[in-house]
Swiss-Prot record:
UniProtKB keywords: Acetylation, Cytoplasm, Cytoskeleton, Hydrolase, Manganese, Metal-binding, Methylation, Nucleus, Protein phosphatase
Quaternary structure and interacting proteins, as annotated: Serine/threonine-protein phosphatase 4 (PP4) occurs in different assemblies of the catalytic and one or more regulatory subunits. Component of the PP4 complexes PPP4C-PPP4R1, PPP4C-PPP4R2, PPP4C-PPP4R2-PPP4R3A, PPP4C-PPP4R2-PPP4R3B and PPP4C-PPP4R4. The PPP4C-PPP4R2 complex appears to be a tetramer composed of 2 molecules of PPP4C and 2 molecules of PPP4R2. Interacts with REL, NFKB1/p50 and RELA. Interacts with SMN1 and GEMIN4. Interacts with IRS4 (phosphorylated). Interacts with SMEK1/PPP4R3A; the interaction requires PP4R2. Interacts with HDAC3.
Molecular function as annotated in GO: metal ion binding; protein serine/threonine phosphatase activity
Organism: Homo sapiens (Human)
Protein name as annotated: Serine/threonine-protein phosphatase 4 catalytic subunit
Amino acid sequence: MAEISDLDRQIEQLRRCELIKESEVKALCAKAREILVEESNVQRVDSPVTVCGDIHGQFYDLKELFRVGGDVPETNYLFMGDFVDRGFYSVETFLLLLALKVRYPDRITLIRGNHESRQITQVYGFYDECLRKYGSVTVWRYCTEIFDYLSLSAIIDGKIFCVHGGLSPSIQTLDQIRTIDRKQEVPHDGPMCDLLWSDPEDTTGWGVSPRGAGYLFGSDVVAQFNAANDIDMICRAHQLVMEGYKWHFNETVLTVWSAPNYCYRCGNVAAILELDEHLQKDFIIFEAAPQETRGIPSKKPVADYFL
């Protein structure tokens, strides 16, 4: 059991927001790949479970989330993507979640967000952070390879469909999602792209997305999809909501946002959704971790001046 104790040590280190060695990242990603490759594009998840939205590298707020929601493995978690970018601690955030996944594979489910992509992370911070913290892009490469193995969606008790963004005009059934070859960079268009990029909109049918990827989808589209797949609701993340969660279309779509005071300046609260074994819902609202518990670095860490 040397591997488990190694992993437990790494988890403790990461919980303290301390980096693990590049060689340890390589080994962790290799183990994660073995687990993730077995998961479905529509990963089955059993209740009770706590569902979480975007985290975006806000490590101390992820610790706050675990403080209010309970730790892994006591609490069963589903994270709906966007672990990295924009926050100061994308590396520690993603590696902690990945280490927990390897240690407790049945107690934490990670699905892919639009930021789990090589192209997006080169623009929004994760690439630069890996380079700064490890002195090379190797760790970024290991992590982005793992992104390709993450599930595209999850289904809780066959009734609640969870996806990062939303629906696609190319997809009417969950079986169609199951046939996608997900082990690739997020494409610029098509069903896999849409699942990670789309947003609900107070309209009917499909609309052009201002994001430049995915679509806007209306209440009629949701009603058809939910009926065709015998599901009660769609749970998704992807959009900042100031109250932490927001219902759409007569409670058939739910947005959950789990990064409080987003980008350290938006002033929003965050939420997680607790589902019991009967799928009864309980929202936990939380605020950003108190200032004194987080060493927020200056925008440009000191190391840069000496490199």
